[in-house]
From Swiss-Prot:
Domain of life (superkingdom): Eukaryota
An annotated GO cellular component: extracellular region
Recorded catalytic activity of this chain's protein: 2 a phenolic donor + H2O2 = 2 a phenolic radical donor + 2 H2O
Main location: secreted
Residues of the active site: 64 (proton acceptor)
Protein name: Cationic peroxidase 1
Assigned keywords, A-Z: Calcium, Disulfide bond, Glycoprotein, Heme, Hydrogen peroxide, Iron, Metal-binding, Oxidoreductase, Peroxidase, Pyrrolidone carboxylic acid, Secreted, Signal
Annotated glycan sites: 82, 166
Residues engaged in binding Ca(2+) 2: 192, 236, 239, 242, 244
EC category name: oxidoreductase
Site (Transition state stabilizer): 60
Signal peptide coordinates: 1-22
InterPro entries found in the cross-reference section: Haem_peroxidase (IPR002016), Haem_peroxidase_sf (IPR010255), Peroxidase_pln (IPR000823), Peroxidases_AS (IPR019794), Peroxidases_heam-ligand_BS (IPR019793), Secretory_peroxidase (IPR033905)
Length: 316
């Protein structure tokens, strides 16, 4: 008996939307480049050992890549006389970093397996390995992404959430990429590591009331009302170089660094999820890994789409 046409259409639709992620596999390089993952891990561990902040920087690179036209390494492309990349976008300029580490990794895997391992996959694996290097839990990275030949400055300016966003803006930015409000709270936990520049939180520490006064004053010492724009302060004041659930504990104590951080715990719908994670690190770790897998599945180029760049900074 034939299915009603509506059900047939639905089944076809479900097959199509699953096609992209179905082509990604955790063992994609098992035979093509068996030492790729260990090479990436070693390079990340070395970079993070030299500078703990680099772990957060590599994690952020993957996020800023995936939120702009999918996980395709477009964020790594340099501007040229006839090509405009995403590095000069407002959320990226003088902010995202770690490109040299990615260059090093790419050079190493190219020497092992020329033209096999994509820059997009390097970003995904480096993000996971950075979290692990700083004490966080691991997750199963799906692989097989290819690299874009295009970038979108306009999308980088419009799609990435800003530090001054209210909760509604954050929910919208993440919803536009298919994430639930819970997953917004989960992925925001990446701010348990890393640092932000004074310009990102100056307004908060001088003008907002939902901030611990002692915490605000300590930040003001390093972030004057005028000047010191690039001075850095850690997102997590308690364990800045450890990937844990302290970010959520800090939010409950009104010690969120950015306006957008504290928006997650401010007498709003997300308060309960922040509280849950502050009380259960294991749940946070599990949810974070699952959310990262989902993020890594944002519009990947697979099969014959895109290319495998030889140099992550430019197209072949």
């Amino acid at each position: 008996m034939a299915l009603p046409i509506s059900k047939v259409d639905f089944l076809i639709f479900m097959c199509l939307i699953g096609l992209g992620s179905a082509q990604l596999s955790s063992n994609f390089y098992a035979t093509k480049c068996p030492n790729a993952l260990s090479t990436i891990k070693s390079a990340v561990n070395s970079a993070v050992a030299k500078e703990a902040r680099m772990g957060a920087s590599l994690l952020r690179l993957h996020f800023h890549d995936c939120f702009v036209q999918g996980c395709d390494a477009s964020v790594l492309l340099d501007d040229t006389s006839n090509f405009t990349g995403e590095k000069t976008a407002g959320p990226n300029a003088n902010s995202i970093r770690g490109f040299e580490v990615i260059d090093t990794i790419k050079s190493q895997v190219e020497s092992l397996c020329p033209g096999v391992v994509s820059c997009a996959d390097i970003l995904a694996v480096a993000a996971r390995d950075s979290v692990v290097a700083l004490g966080g839990a691991s997750w199963n990275v799906l692989l097989g992404r290819r690299d874009s030949t295009t970038a979108s400055l306009s999308s980088a300016n419009s799609d990435l959430p800003a530090p001054f966003f209210n909760l509604s803006g954050l929910i919208s930015a993440f919803s536009n990429k298919g994430f639930t409000t819970k997953e917004l709270v989960t992925l925001s936990g990446a701010h348990t590591i890393g640092q932000a520049q004074c310009t990102a939180f100056r307004t908060r520490i001088y003008n907002e009331s939902n901030i611990d006064p002692t915490y605000a004053k300590s930040l003001q010492a390093n972030c004057p009302s005028v000047g010191g724009d690039t001075n850095l302060s850690p997102f997590d004041v308690t364990t800045p170089n450890k990937f844990d659930n302290a970010y959520y504990i800090n939010l409950r104590n009104k010690k969120g660094l950015l306006h957008s951080d504290q928006q997650l715990f401010n007498g709003v719908s997300t308060d309960s999820q922040v509280t849950a994670y502050s009380n259960n690190a294991a749940t946070f770790n599990t949810d974070f890994g699952n959310a990262m897998i989902k993020m890594g599945n944002l519009s990947p180029l697979t099969g014959t789409s895109g290319q495998i760049r030889t140099n992550c900074r430019k197209t072949n």
